[in-house]
Amino acid sequence: MFDLILKNGLIVDPLNGTNEVGDLAVKEGKIEMIGHDLSNAKEIEDCQGKLVMPGLIDAHMHFGSVYGSKHGARMTALAGVTTCLDMAGPLDEVLKTTKRSGAGITFGIVDRYDPNSMHGTASPSDKQITDWTHSHTEGGALGVKLVGGHWPLDPATCHKVIELCNEENLYVAWHAGSTNNKS
């Protein structure tokens, strides 16, 4: 017996070349079978006129208040996204907001580094960069996002952050811009 059968949906699975109307059976959280006229399940859901496909991955989105919304996790889930990468944080806020939303999204955070507001300078010391990076990755961030396009950083700071992330095998993202080109 299956736990769930999704009946009569348009099943799309690019990896396996599936693009047809049919039934999809789930057992213990895993797809057990794709076919036609499947039955014998604890729950059967009619999906006629609907897509049945793997969850989408959004590699760049924002849950935090700086660029996003407290409703971001719910809105993202409603769009079919099951896995995403928040590219700005702030870490603590995103963790609280997504936990409260109950949307069930798997996500990671690459936290925004803005030394002007965090340290009062666009040219922080190596220790300031290292301490901030460690405190955020220990808190759950996967890496650092430089937001030079919004808050220009000097090239030396950008270099230090990228070098540190490389040494420590952390993600680094860069919203291009520096004090050299005033962007």
Model-derived segments and their meaning:
Residues P14, C47, A59-M61, M87, ...:
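Generic detector of well-ordered alpha-helical packing
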Residues C47, S69-L153, T157, I162-L170:
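Divalent-metal coordination cores built from histidine and acidic residues
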Residues G9, L24, G29, G49, ...:
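Divalent metal-coordination and catalytic microenvironments
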Residues D13-P14, M53, S117:
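Short, solvent-exposed loop/turn elements at domain surfaces
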Residues N181-S183:
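Catalytic core of soluble alpha/beta enzymes
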Residues G55-V66, G148, V172-T179:
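Histidine-centered catalytic micro-motifs
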